[in-house]
A protein has these predicted regions:
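Active-site neighborhoods and metal-handling regions in enzymes and metal-associated proteins
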Residues: 1-278
Length: 278
């Protein structure tokens, strides 16, 4: 069953989403050469405390940290550690969430540590982020879940990969419903699987975390011995972007974007829903 939210509940999720946005801003500034991924976790904990918010990652299924810090070939669920020191040229994806009065926010971004990154890495992150926005733009009343998957996949497949070949759209992980829990039905693939059908129709009150994960090579992954860290099987580097989005009668509201998604959705000719906290 898909949890449909009231306008008041979406407003609470917007509060949680803005805390996530604040964590993103603080960790992005702190992700510099010489910092450890545990340093970034400490930054996130400080932001949560300042906003009287709870972490939704810490303790989830036994996860031992507040945020996920996934460096280079790590796709998702990297565990912050004092032993992982960021270096010039690294790429890091930071995934984090927050809870306000029982309502969840969840989002991720990819950042470049230092300078001197290969153009293929810059393009990988751009393609992944833009495919997320294509998916968000497809979150409109009357569409079905598969329309979001199709929008994400179509955008990625239309982008030429530097050096040839195709980007790997990660198969084993995807987006999800969000609300009173961080992960809820429905599961959202980042590609079209016709065996799954079209999925539910999108109606006001529908809330999703849309999160493409893309690699420079394989779509296949494996989990390391810590039972959390997910890496590409061929060692190619990856990118991960995510926003939590609510569908309202006035259109989509990107709960974890500071401006509610207004600027990016305008590029698609879409007006973002009014911010309930404005």
């Amino acid at each position: 069953m898909v949890q449909i939210k009231s306008p008041e509940q979406i407003a609470k999720m917007r509060e949680a989403g803005l805390v996530v946005a604040a964590i993103h801003a603080a960790t992005r500034e702190a992700a510099v050469p010489g910092a450890t991924t545990k340093d970034l976790d400490r930054v996130a904990r400080k932001v949560l405390a300042e906003h009287n918010a709870k972490p939704n990652f810490l303790g989830y299924g036994g996860f031992p940290a507040t945020i996920c810090t996934s460096v280079n070939e790590v796709v998702v669920h990297g565990i912050p550690s004092d032993d992982v020191v960021l270096k010039d040229g690294d790429v890091i994806s930071i995934d984090c969430g927050a809870i306000i009065d029982g309502w969840h926010g969840d989002a991720a971004y990819t950042a470049f540590v230092g300078s001197g990154h290969a153009s293929e890495l810059v393009e990988l992150s751009r393609v992944t982020e833009e495919s997320m926005w294509a998916g968000i733009a497809a979150m409109r009343q009357g569409n079905r879940l598969v329309d979001i998957s199709r929008a994400v996949e179509t955008y990625i497949r239309r982008q030429p990969k530097p050096g040839g070949g195709r980007y790997g759209i990660i198969e084993d992980y995807g987006g999800h419903g969000i609300g009173t829990e961080m992960h809820m039905d429905p599961h959202l693939l980042n590609y079209v699987d016709r065996r799954r059908g079209k999925g539910p129709k999108l109606v006001p009150g529908f809330c999703l975390a849309i999160e493409p994960m893309v690699s420079l090579g394989t779509p296949k992954t494996q989990v390391l011995e810590d039972d959390w860290t997910v890496v590409t099987t061929d060692g190619t580097w990856s990118s991960h972007w995510e926003h939590s989005v609510a569908l309202t009668p006035e259109g989509p509201l990107v709960l974890t974007a500071p401006d509610g998604g207004r600027a990016k959705l305008a590029e698609y000719g879409i007006t973002a829903a009014p911010d309930p906290l404005a």
